[in-house]
């Protein structure tokens, strides 16, 4: 039979493929790529670019399994002494590894593969849901496809660090917030209030920095509901906040029992602010220094303090740096912007870091910016103040998150991996831009064909 017959038959059949089938294929692709990354990282936990923290989580989980609790056998970053309690690392992620090691023995590759499967499926699906909600189903599929093949997400998908689960939890929280902003039914608001509380609780226990965004999230929900003339859902908000407290409180009490002082979640904010704003930099931030350099910053009179006390003392010192020379702090913060949004290759980076950076953020950044600008100029409703309408829209929520989250790190300590949640949130805008570019190109091609035919 004529080969053209098969081609025509295939093209006709392809048009019958549903969006659901396409999405399933995209999700399977995302899972396979992340599982491949997990297998390449293997059963050894070694020093690799951008994922050094996995060594700490692996060691800490082994100590918990062996009955030593959250401690290290040797002096560990930042300056935690052997056998002394640590709260520097996410308890939830450590317990995830502990559960895997308890069930299967010290098999990091199993933790990697399970994580790759869960994150590959959920992060891709949530990206689709958010993009579909803001734009359209087609754009949701494009966004899911971008997320599936995004090199940073593939690389980190198998790394034993909080980032994969954390980014997924952020997307889950943002999507539930979008739903909360539009629901009128009381029972549904209660249902989504509970879901949002669980999502936010998981997110902050993975990385406490997200706590700084939560007030803005609820303010956005209230304003969005007010603009839609819906009740302010105070009961569902109270449920959400209550569930966050339930997630955080056990850790706070545990820290109190170990350190004899209040530690909300983790002992890392003081270290980060102190290290990130030390006069050593002058007005030019350097993202990564040698460990010995960081340790040399810590005053000798503070080195005898336990981890929690030292964290609080260093936060005070860091704030004093700002008060002593606010101009330097402003210039130093500005210098963090290129480091945070770096998309170009660097001779200081490894080959894998350069490939991941350029092939993911470097390729998608122009489309992200294109999509953002297009959305900023787009009218979401025909009446009312344009900026308020934009702010109260799901688009506005993603923009607010990106601005707040970037600002937090620009003002403290900026690393590329700290930007990855923003990448995930901006992917729907890149998908919108890609769709728009193809539509414009198609129109021009059709015009050329029409002109040629006439």
Feature map (PLM): residue ranges:
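Transmembrane-helix motifs of polytopic, lipid-linked glycan transferases
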Residues: 113-135, 172, 176, 366-373
């Amino acid at each position: 039979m004529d080969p053209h017959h098969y081609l025509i038959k295939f093209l006709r059949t392809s048009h019958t493929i549903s969006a659901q089938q396409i999405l399933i294929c995209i999700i399977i692709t995302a899972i396979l790529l992340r599982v491949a990354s997990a297998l390449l990282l293997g059963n050894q936990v070694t020093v690799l670019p951008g994922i050094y923290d996995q060594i700490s989580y692996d060691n800490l989980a082994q100590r918990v399994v062996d009955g030593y609790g959250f401690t290290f056998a040797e002096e560990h970053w930042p300056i935690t002494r052997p056998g002394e309690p640590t709260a520097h690392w996410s308890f939830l992620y450590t317990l995830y590894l502990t559960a895997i090691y308890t069930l299967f023995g010290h098999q990091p590759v199993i933790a990697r593969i399970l994580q790759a499967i869960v994150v590959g499926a959920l992060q891709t699906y949530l990206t689709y849901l958010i993009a579909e909600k803001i734009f359209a189903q087609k754009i949701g599929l494009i966004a899911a496809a971008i997320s599936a093949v995004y090199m940073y997400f593939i690389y980190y998908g198998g790394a034993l660090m909080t980032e994969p689960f954390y980014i997924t939890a952020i997307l889950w929280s943002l999507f539930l917030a979008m739903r909360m902003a539009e629901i009128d039914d009381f029972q549904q608001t209660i249902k989504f209030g509970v879901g949002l509380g669980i999502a936010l609780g998981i997110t902050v226990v993975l990385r406490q920095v997200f706590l700084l965004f939560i007030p803005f999230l609820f303010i956005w929900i209230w304003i969005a509901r007010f603009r839609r003339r819906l009740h302010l859902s105070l009961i569902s908000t109270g449920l959400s906040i209550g569930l966050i407290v339930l997630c955080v409180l056990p850790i706070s009490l545990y820290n109190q029992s170990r350190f004899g002082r209040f530690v909300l979640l983790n002992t890392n904010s003081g270290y980060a602010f102190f290290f990130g704003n030390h006069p050593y930099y002058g007005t030019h931030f350097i993202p990564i220094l040698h460990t010995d350099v960081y340790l040399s910053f810590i005053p000798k009179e503070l080195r005898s303090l336990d981890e929690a006390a030292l964290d609080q003392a260093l936060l005070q010192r860091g704030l004093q740096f700002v008060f002593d020379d606010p101009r330097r702090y402003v210039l130093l913060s500005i210098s963090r912007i290129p480091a945070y949004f770096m998309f170009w290759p660097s001779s200081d980076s490894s080959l894998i870091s350069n490939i991941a950076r350029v092939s993911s953020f470097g390729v998608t950044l122009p489309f992200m910016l294109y999509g953002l600008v297009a959305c900023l100029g787009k009218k979401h409703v025909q009446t009312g103040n344009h900026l308020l309408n934009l702010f109260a829209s799901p688009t506005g929520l993603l923009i607010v998150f990106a601005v707040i989250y970037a600002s937090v790190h620009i003002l403290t300590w900026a690393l590329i991996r700290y930007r990855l949640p923003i990448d995930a949130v901006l992917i729907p805008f890149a998908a919108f831009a890609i769709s728009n570019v193809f539509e414009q190109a198609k129109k021009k091609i059709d015009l050329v064909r029409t002109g040629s035919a006439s």
